[in-house]
Amino acid sequence: MRKFTILLMLLLASSAQAARIKDVAQVAGVRNNQLVGYGLVTGLPGTGESTPFTDQSFNAMLQSFGIQLPPGTKPKTKNVAAVIVTADLPAFSKQGQTIDITVSSIGSAKSLRGGTLMQTFLKGLDGQVYAVAQGNLVVSGFSATGADGSKIVGNNPTVGMISSGAIVEREVPNPFGRGDYITFNLFESDFTTAQRLADAVNQFLGPQMASAVDAASIKVRAPRDLSQRVAFLSAIENLEFNPADSAAKIIVNSRTGTIVVGQNVRLKPAAVTHGGMTVAIKENLNVSQPNALGGGQTVVVPNTEIEVTEKQGKMFKLEPGVTLDDLVRAVNEVGAAPSDLMAILQALKQAGAIEGQLIII
């Protein structure tokens, strides 16, 4: 009998567990920026491609080096692949620092293993170049093809990474040193948590130094001098306070049968019964052979057999205040399958018997 995996999120009461401000919020404007670029990977051992856009890019690269191919010449670029290069530019990155990059094939290349990324410009949302990437790829996947067409692929050979593969050429401006206030944005919006964070800052700095703007933002008065502002933030982000209890949630992975239950999830009184039905369809092909002198034709006649089996469901009652942990144990005892539990949870939610959010992924 298959048992469900239950992960009980021990979300302790706010009075018993404190958190640092830096663990629940971040300074507004201090964030990563996504970069993207188009480039070529060369040096592949015959696992590249020869698509129109790859050939065009290859010719453009040769022209940039002063090499002009004769008109009508089509290069065989089986050792070249067109790729998209992506990276995250961290906040406060300076010119000359390096960042990691991910390289992904966009054509029909079989593998990027053993390839070298040619110089690629990485641009931001504004179209400006912020970093330049180049280097040898590290590919964890592999692929092999036999003479008879058989093929084996492990992991993903068309995606690779280059550690410190891009050099930062342009810095991203941020509003860290502007104005008289700094805003903290909560990772999880909650009015109670926002107010408690503001209260903790006011208790540390003095009254009216911080205020909750909404469920996600807390505005804090800060010194204008940058050096003082850094020291100020260092002290503030390490303050401990008691966040609000997390919202009652049930996260169910229907593919693995994993269930994550929040501490505050409760069930109202209900009675549950669930039966299972199995439909088996069997196709048989019968041959109709006519008499040799009859002049008829041999035909294949399909014969379909359908069998329906239904097992009787067991009923169990949920008492007031029962937790979802108790429900899952009851479902396991009656031998339900993962799909059965999904149906039971959805039905309980529709009946209003679950006090919390049900999220199925």
Curated annotation (Swiss-Prot):
The protein's job, in short, is: Assembles around the rod to form the L-ring and probably protects the motor/basal body from shearing forces during rotation.
Q: Which GO terms describe its cellular component?
A: bacterial-type flagellum basal body, distal rod, P ring; outer membrane-bounded periplasmic space
Domain of life (superkingdom)? Bacteria
NCBIfam families in the cross-refs: PRK05303.1
Record carries keyword Signal = yes
* Family annotation (InterPro entries): Flag_FlgI
According to its UniProt entry, the protein's GO biological process terms are: bacterial-type flagellum-dependent cell motility
Taxonomic source organism: Vibrio cholerae serotype O1 (strain ATCC 39315 / El Tor Inaba N16961)
Q: Can you tell me which family this protein belongs to?
A: Belongs to the FlgI family.
Q: Which UniProt keywords apply?
A: Bacterial flagellum, Periplasm, Signal
Compartments annotated for it: namely: Periplasm; Bacterial flagellum basal body
What GO molecular functions are on record for this protein?
structural molecule activity
Q: What name is this protein filed under?
A: Flagellar P-ring protein
Q: Which Pfam families match?
A: FlgI
Look up the signal peptide feature and give its range.
1-18
Q: How does this protein assemble?
A: The basal body constitutes a major portion of the flagellar organelle and consists of four rings (L,P,S, and M) mounted on a central rod.
